[in-house]
């Protein structure tokens, strides 16, 4: 009885070891048009200034990154209050999150 289960298990292990490795998948990086990123930054500063009741000149945007088909801009106010602006894949403003 033990031998009947042993041979199929060994055959399975040998076949698994012979399979070719799957190719490594890499995240796609899309280069953002500079004009679009500047427009997104201006919109982010405008929305943050309204949310924090301050002027756009007192808002700093520090990071811009692509994240799962959308974009995020991180920044802070002159009072060191952090926020994140989110944009869709086309660069349209989605929301501002206070951190």
From Swiss-Prot:
Q: Where is the lipid attached (S-diacylglycerol cysteine)?
A: 18
UniProt-recorded name of the protein: Uncharacterized lipoprotein YsaB
First and last residue of the signal peptide: 1-17
Subcellular locations according to the entry: Cell membrane
What gene is this protein translated from? ysaB
Which Pfam families has this protein been placed in?
A: YsaB
GO CC, alphabetical: plasma membrane
Q: What is its main location?
A: membrane
Q: Which UniProt keywords apply?
A: Cell membrane, Lipoprotein, Membrane, Palmitate, Signal
Does the UniProt entry include the keyword Lipoprotein? yes
How does this chain sit within the bilayer? Lipid-anchor
Lipid moiety (N-palmitoyl cysteine) attached at 18
